[in-house]
UniProtKB/Swiss-Prot annotation:
Topology within the bilayer: Peripheral membrane protein
Region (Disordered), start-end ranges: 89-108
A single GO molecular function term of this UniProt record: metal ion binding
Function (record text): Mitochondrial intermembrane chaperone that participates in the import and insertion of some multi-pass transmembrane proteins into the mitochondrial inner membrane. Also required for the transfer of beta-barrel precursors from the TOM complex to the sorting and assembly machinery (SAM complex) of the outer membrane. Acts as a chaperone-like protein that protects the hydrophobic precursors from aggregation and guide them through the mitochondrial intermembrane space.
Coiled coil: none
Protein name from the UniProt record: Mitochondrial import inner membrane translocase subunit tim-13
InterPro entries for this protein: Tim10-like (IPR004217), Tim10-like_dom_sf (IPR035427)
Entry text on domains: The twin CX3C motif contains 4 conserved Cys residues that form 2 disulfide bonds in the mitochondrial intermembrane space. However, during the transit of tin-13/tim-13 from cytoplasm into mitochondrion, the Cys residues probably coordinate zinc, thereby preventing folding and allowing its transfer across mitochondrial outer membrane.
The keyword Ion transport is assigned to this record: no
């Protein structure tokens, strides 16, 4: 399902087709999320740690980059887990309806 579907069209799909659309959207979102993460880490850690660009990294720059990436990943994981938990709580409190598409998978 490469084309964009509006809500009315999605409602007309079978539950299996809805799950397929949702799965595709989740995969695209995960890929975009990973690309954004790599871009953010590269920009932030490079700007912070590499003070004198050259043909190789100094040992202090390597250590700084490693610590920066580790902290960034830890923070990103914490934020992701917190967001996922909140989405799951919202889904549970709203009766578990997946955005009006029935009992299919959620976007959490």
């Amino acid at each position: 399902m490469d084309q964009l579907l509006d809500v009315e069209t999605l409602k007309k799909l079978s539950p299996e087709q809805q799950e397929q659309v949702i799965s595709g959207v989740k995969q695209q979102a995960a890929l975009a999320n990973a690309q954004n993460l790599v871009t953010d880490i590269s920009e932030k850690c490079t700007n912070k740690c590499i003070t004198a660009p050259g043909s190789s990294l100094a040992s202090g720059e390597k250590q700084c980059l490693q610590r920066c990436m580790d902290r960034f990943m830890e923070s990103w994981n914490l934020v992701s887990q917190t967001l996922q938990k909140r989405l799951q709580e919202e889904m549970a409190s709203s009766g578990g309806m997946g955005g009006g598409f029935g009992q299919g998978p959620s976007f959490s």
